[in-house]
């Protein structure tokens, strides 16, 4: 076999750059929210599974939380169930909740588990109902206009927020060399099911586990300034300033607040990374430059 010296040299450089990061993160827990384009491209799905397996192989403990909004929308359409959204949240009546559980807890979760296992990992699929992994309550949504004397309370059905996370279960699985893959479905005090935003679940899981990192895969290059340049490293104080001056707005706000809350809740750093980039997770962890925006209380990169 002919040795391509340039290729071999490049591999050596990559490994050399990665080694200090591998040493730093051995034994640490990283929570990765998996969604967006990274779940739709076969090449990116395979790359993600391989990245997760590699992380586990070098002694890092990945915990995956996944979304699945497009897949839910597809099945609802096929079943002739109309979708409604309020402030970006899917109104979830009983029929819609049944579909959410089928898609997230069944199809999507098991596809991810199967893909990781096919590439040499030991993934195990969970929803928040397993061993009451994610205790939840109904999310209250209100609106108020200048003409209103009191806020209007809007019922969006089985949409929830996280009350608590069963860390004993997750720690047991991690210590057993399993890779937890979590569907963002919570369970209420009376056993009722709740549809919860996957970013929020990932953030709360990261906080509860005191994870080293929270990584949110997105369909953008990272958090950008007003000139469209990616901001690679920010402190929590700088993020709050960008929210206040309107640089961060609209649909990006909930994701950024989730990342911010995680850091303020004890996670060492949050990362908004471009899930469209092959091997984005590894590039963000193991290279000097990364592929997104890092948010931390420490001096940014």
Curated annotation (Swiss-Prot):
Pathway: Amino-acid biosynthesis; L-arginine biosynthesis; N(2)-acetyl-L-ornithine from L-glutamate: step 2/4. Substrate binds at residues 68-69, 90, 195. InterPro entries: AceGlu_kinase-like_sf, AcgluKinase_fam, ArgB, Asp/Glu/Uridylate_kinase, Glu/AcGlu_kinase, NAGK-C. The record marks 33, 255 as: Transition state stabilizer. GO terms for molecular function: acetylglutamate kinase activity; ATP binding. Keywords: Amino-acid biosynthesis, Arginine biosynthesis, ATP-binding, Cytoplasm, Kinase, Nucleotide-binding, Transferase. Belongs to the acetylglutamate kinase family. ArgB subfamily. PANTHER family: N-ACETYLGLUTAMATE SYNTHASE (PTHR23342), N-ACETYLGLUTAMATE SYNTHASE, MITOCHONDRIAL (PTHR23342:SF0). This is Acetylglutamate kinase. The lineage of its organism: Bacteria, Pseudomonadati, Pseudomonadota, Gammaproteobacteria, Pseudomonadales. The gene is argB.
């Amino acid at each position: 076999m002919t040795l391509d010296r340039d290729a071999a040299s490049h591999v050596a450089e990559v490994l050399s750059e990665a080694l200090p990061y591998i040493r730093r993160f051995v034994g640490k827990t990283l929570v990765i929210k998996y969604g967006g384009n990274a779940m739709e491209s076969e090449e990116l799905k395979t790359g993600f599974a391989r990245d997760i397996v590699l992380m586990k192989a070098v002694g890092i403990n990945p915990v995956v939380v996944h979304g699945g909004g497009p897949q839910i929308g597809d099945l609802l359409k096929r079943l002739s169930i109309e979708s409604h959204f309020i402030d970006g949240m899917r109104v979830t009546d009983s029929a819609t909740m049944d579909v959410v559980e089928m898609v997230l807890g069944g199809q999507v979760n098991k596809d991810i588990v199967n893909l990781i296992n096919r590439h040499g990992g030991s993934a195990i699929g969970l929803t928040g109902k397993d061993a009451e992994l994610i205790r939840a309550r109904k999310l209250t949504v209100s609106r108020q206009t200048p003409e209103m004397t009191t806020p209007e309370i809007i019922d969006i059905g089985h949409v929830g927020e996280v009350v608590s996370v069963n860390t004993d279960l997750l720690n047991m699985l991690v210590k057993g060399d399993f890779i937890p893959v979590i569907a963002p479905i919570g369970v209420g005090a009376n056993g009722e099911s709740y549809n919860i935003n996957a970013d929020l679940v990932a953030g709360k899981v990261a906080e509860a586990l005191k994870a080293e990192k929270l990584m949110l895969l997105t369909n953008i290059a990272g958090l950008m300034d007003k000139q469209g340049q990616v901001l690679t490293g920010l402190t929590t104080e700088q993020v709050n300033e960008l929210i206040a001056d309107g640089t961060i707005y609209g649909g990006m706000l909930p994701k950024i607040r989730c990342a911010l809350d995680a850091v303020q809740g004890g996670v060492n750093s949050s990362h908004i990374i471009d899930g469209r980039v092959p091997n984005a997770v590894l590039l963000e962890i193991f290279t000097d430059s990364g592929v997104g925006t890092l948010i931390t209380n420490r001096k940014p990169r």
